[in-house]
Amino acid sequence: MKAAAGALGGGMPGTCAAERKAYGTPAPGRQTLALGRMASAGSDAAFLARNAAESLPAGGLAHKLEQAAQAGRPLRVKLGLDPTAPDIHLGHTVVLQKLREFQDLGHRVVLIVGDYTARVGDPSGRSDTRPVLTGEEIGANARTYEQQAFKVLDADPGRYELRFNGEWLDMRMEELFRLTRTTTVAQLLDREDFATRYAAGAPISILELLYPLMQGYDSVAVRSDVELGGTDQTFNLLLARDIQRHYGLPEQTVLTLPILPGTDGVDKMSKTRGNQIGITEAPEEMFGKTMRLPDDAMDTWFDLLALGRPPAGTAPRDAKRALARAIVTRFHDAAAAAGAQAHFDRVFVEHELPAEIDDSAIDARDGLVHLPAALASAFGVSRSEVRRLLAQGGVKLDGEPLGAGDLDLPIARVHGVVVQLGRRRFRRLQVR
């Protein structure tokens, strides 16, 4: 896909001409930062780095901002996302929100969808080799990313550019040889995850060793001034500086953000671990999953998601409800948040059924309904998940839990009955 085109320009009351030239003009009505309060590159840099884990090299961001102001151009601020799953989750929004802050100061975001690097899979933090995705899976996931990213980013074409790294990584062998000459195997094995796997005798594929070089070449291709990423990306982001230098380009500044723990409060949020909240999930799902968060992880979520903490002394349960409402409001609206809270209270506090339950048509054979097949169809899950939930007592018919042996039930016991799958999913079954 070609990059979005557009130029910054115009004026803004209360700012000098140099600031207007460097930062552009916020669209009317947007909640933009007052540039008059950000008159110096040093104060801009301090603001942007205030909740970051690291800004590397020291003083580099302020220097980049000074250079951009002198040249009368916005910074090119890069973030790469590999479409290894169809949904952007809350963990991604920590760095997306930082990108938005750069946009609000008039800079240009370059969002790179890693359709090519996703074929390899980022090995950062991995103790094994990632499974390979098909081209169809990667393409389907990639198509959802831009729309989801706009839930956080400003879609103004003057402040936003979308690129797919397949544009430049589908390179000739001669170009690949030039890229690989920029880095040594010893450098790559300095990475903690590679070093650990190498010491343990675990396999490391050549493709995985190439991944940091491919990510670094992205910075060459888009001429990035600043790159953002999680703290698990520090090695890759710094390596990109070396690669840019080898190609005769100015080295980017690196800004790393803390990693948001998942709903378990321990591990990094990811779909693989099943502890994620997707930003397109239904309000009721968002609210309910947030309420599962351990109390000791709440402050981290409030801070990293840039949500105001409740007053000191607020009871943990009330603080968590406030957190859940704020998350749903951000990605839906206040009315949806109120409805999600009412749904949660009705189902999990008052133990009543939801106000609205969708019907699902299911099939029967010889007078029996085979639950694994019927519920898989009704809820859009796998039969193995239905069997697992049956064994765990996680399937209820009209409030009565079923067991692992309840695989085939008479039509009379199922038709018109409300089935609950897990904690928050309900359907009324209608036998065809």
Residue map of PLM features:
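Conserved nucleotide- and phosphate/pyrophosphate-binding catalytic cores
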Residues: I243-R432
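Short, positively charged and aromatic/hydrophobic N-terminal segments
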Residues: P13, Y23, Q31-M38
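N-terminal catalytic cores of NTP/NDP-binding nucleotidyl/phosphoryl-transfer enzymes
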Residues: L61-P123, L228-T234, A240
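Divalent-metal (Mg2+/Mn2+/Ca2+)-assisted nucleotide/phosphate chemistry catalytic cores
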Residues: P131-T256
